[in-house]
C-alpha cells in the first residue's frame, strides 16, 4: 500500500539526515496530543538547528495503542499534522521520531532497555490523569490500583507508566548511569508534582533506598501545555487524505495555536525548545493561573451565556460583537488584574490570541460540552477571582454575569422553554432546588451549596446582591441582551 513515504506529496517531507537523530527522549503515551505538541516542537527544532534530540515513542496499552505503533513503523515513523486555521489548513510531515516500541512487539525488556540506555536523558509522559494511578482523595499513589499491584508483584515486567519509570531508574542506578528527567506533559495542574508523588510512592513501596536515590537524582519539572487537538475521526482522516493525496492512518488535526511553558529543571540536558516557541521559566504556576482564569474562565462565561443565547459553538458566540467584546473585557479588566505574572508577560497579546482561537470555526467546540461539570469548574475559574476583587475593591460585573449564567443554565430549561441536558455531579441538588425555589430564593438556595461557594461568599452582601441582580436580569431580558448591556 502507498504511504506518505513513497508518494508525491503537496508538502515537503523532513529534509535533514534522519541518521543524526539519537533516541535521547523516551516518550510514554504516543497519543494525538503528543504528536501535535511535543513531537512537533522537537521536529521544528531539528528542522532549524543541528539538534540530535530524537524521540523513542512507547505505547503501553493493547488495541489501538499497538496499531498506531505498527502504522508508524510502516511509514518510517513519519506522520501528518493538519493545523486548521479559520481560513486555511497547513499540512506538516513530522519527523522527530527515531523509534516506536510496544510491549506486545518489543517486550517489557525492550522498552526498559531503551529507558536505561546511557543517551536517554528525558522520559516524558502523556498518559492522562488516570495514568498516574493516584488516589483521588489523598493525591498519593493508589497501592490498590490493579496496575500498581501488578507492578509491585512483577517489578521487572511492569504494566503502568509509573512502573516502567521506577524499574528503568533502578536499572540505571545499578549500572552507575546518570538518572533521567521525568517530564509530564499532561494537562494536569502542577503535573511534575503529580508525577513525582507517583514515582516516589511506588519506589518507596519497592525499596526505600531506591526512593531516596530517585529523590536525590531525578527532577520532575512542571509544564503547562496548550493546544486544542480533537480526537481523530474517520472524517478528519479522510479530509487530510483528500488534501494529501494519500491516506495517513496516523494523521491528526489541531488548531494553529500552540503553547508550552516548561520549568527549567533538568538533570541530564534538554533540547533548546525555546528556539522554536516554548518558554523555559523558573515557576510554571503563574502561567497555569493565567490559562485557568483567562482561557478557561472566559470559556465558561461564553459556554453558559452562549448556550442560553442560542449558540451551539464557541466560534458561533464570537460572531456576535457583544460576546467578543465581553469575553475580552472579562479577560483584561477582571481576570488579568488577579494574576501575578513574571515581568515582560504581555497579557493583552495573550487575550487577543485567545479571542482569535475562540473565533476559529473549524474547531466546533460546543458550548454544551464546556458547560459540563460547572460545579467543579466554577470555584477556580470565576469565584476565586471574585474573592480577590471583593478584597481589593475591583470591578467584576462580567464575573457576576458569568456566575448568574451558570445559575440560569442549571435550571435545565433554555430561553425557548426547551430542556437543557445538564451534566454535573451535583445535578440532583440542582433539581431539588429547582423544584422548590425560584427568583431570588433560588439564587439563595444555590449559594447554600458550600461545595461550590464555601462559607464566605454567601455571607458577603455585595456578592449576593450582584449575583442576584444579574440572575434576575437574565431571567427577564435573556442572555444576548444582558451581554450587550455589559
Please place each PLM-identified region on the residue numbering.
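Substrate/ligand-engaging "lid" and interaction regions
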Residues: 1-486
Amino acid at each position: 500500500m502507498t504511504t506518505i513515504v513513497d508518494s508525491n506529496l503537496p508538502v515537503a517531507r523532513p529534509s535533514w539526515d534522519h541518521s543524526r537523530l539519537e533516541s535521547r527522549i523516551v516518550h510514554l503515551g504516543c497519543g494525538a496530543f503528543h504528536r501535535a505538541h511535543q513531537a512537533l516542537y522537537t521536529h521544528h527544532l531539528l528542522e532549524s538547528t543541528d539538534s540530535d534530540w530524537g524521540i523513542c515513542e512507547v505505547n503501553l496499552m493493547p488495541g489501538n495503542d499497538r496499531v498506531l505503533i505498527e502504522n508508524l513503523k510502516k511509514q518510517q515513523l513519519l506522520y501528518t499534522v493538519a493545523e486548521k486555521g479559520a481560513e486555511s489548513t497547513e499540512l506538516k510531515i513530522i519527523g522527530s521520531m527515531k523509534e516506536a516500541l510496544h510491549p506486545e512487539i518489543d517486550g517489557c525488556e525492550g522498552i526498559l532497555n531503551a529507558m536505561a540506555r546511557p543517551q536517554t536523558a528525558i522520559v516524558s509522559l502523556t498518559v492522562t490523569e488516570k495514568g498516574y494511578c493516584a488516589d483521588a482523595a489523598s493525591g498519593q499513589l493508589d497501592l490498590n490500583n490493579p496496575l500498581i499491584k501488578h507492578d509491585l508483584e512483577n517489578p521487572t515486567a511492569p504494566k503502568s507508566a509509573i512502573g516502567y519509570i521506577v524499574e528503568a531508574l533502578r536499572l540505571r542506578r545499578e549500572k552507575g548511569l546518570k538518572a533521567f528527567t521525568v517530564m509530564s506533559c499532561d494537562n494536569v495542574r502542577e503535573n511534575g508534582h503529580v508525577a513525582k508523588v507517583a514515582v516516589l510512592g511506588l519506589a518507596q513501596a519497592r525499596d526505600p533506598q531506591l526512593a531516596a536515590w530517585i529523590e536525590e537524582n531525578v527532577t520532575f519539572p512542571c509544564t503547562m501545555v496548550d493546544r486544542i487537538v480533537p480526537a481523530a475521526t474517520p472524517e478528519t482522516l479522510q479530509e487530510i487524505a483528500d488534501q494529501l493525496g494519500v491516506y495517513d492512518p496516523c494523521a491528526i488535526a489541531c488548531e494553529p495555536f500552540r503553547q508550552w511553558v516548561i520549568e527549567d529543571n533538568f538533570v541530564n540536558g534538554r533540547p533548546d525548545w525555546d528556539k522554536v516557541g516554548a518558554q523555559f521559566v523558573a515557576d510554571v504556576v503563574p502561567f497555569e493561573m493565567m490559562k485557568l482564569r483567562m482561557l478557561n474562565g472566559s470559556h465558561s462565561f461564553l459556554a453558559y451565556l452562549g448556550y442560553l443565547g442560542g449558540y451551539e459553538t464557541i466560534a458561533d458566540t464570537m460572531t456576535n460583537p457583544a460576546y467578543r467584546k465581553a469575553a475580552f473585557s472579562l479577560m483584561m479588566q477582571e481576570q488579568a488584574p488577579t494574576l501575578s505574572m513574571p515581568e515582560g508577560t504581555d497579557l493583552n497579546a495573550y487575550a487577543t490570541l485567545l479571542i482569535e482561537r475562540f473565533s476559529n470555526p473549524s474547531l466546533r467546540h460546543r458550548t454544551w460540552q464546556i458547560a459540563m461539570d460547572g460545579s467543579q469548574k466554577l470555584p477556580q475559574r470565576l469565584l476565586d477571582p471574585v474573592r480577590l476583587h471583593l478584597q481589593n475593591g475591583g470591578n467584576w460585573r462580567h464575573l457576576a454575569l458569568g456566575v448568574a449564567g451558570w445559575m440560569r443554565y442549571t435550571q435545565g430549561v433554555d430561553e425557548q422553554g426547551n430542556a437543557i441536558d445538564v451534566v454535573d455531579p451535583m445535578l440532583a441538588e440542582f433539581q431539588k432546588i429547582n423544584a422548590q425555589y425560584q427568583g431570588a430564593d433560588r439564587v439563595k438556595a444555590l449559594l447554600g451549596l458550600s461545595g461550590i461557594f464555601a462559607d464566605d461568599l454567601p455571607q458577603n452582601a455585595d456578592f449576593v446582591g450582584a449575583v442576584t441582580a444579574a440572575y434576575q436580569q437574565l431571567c427577564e431580558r435573556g442572555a444576548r441582551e444582558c451581554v450587550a448591556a455589559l
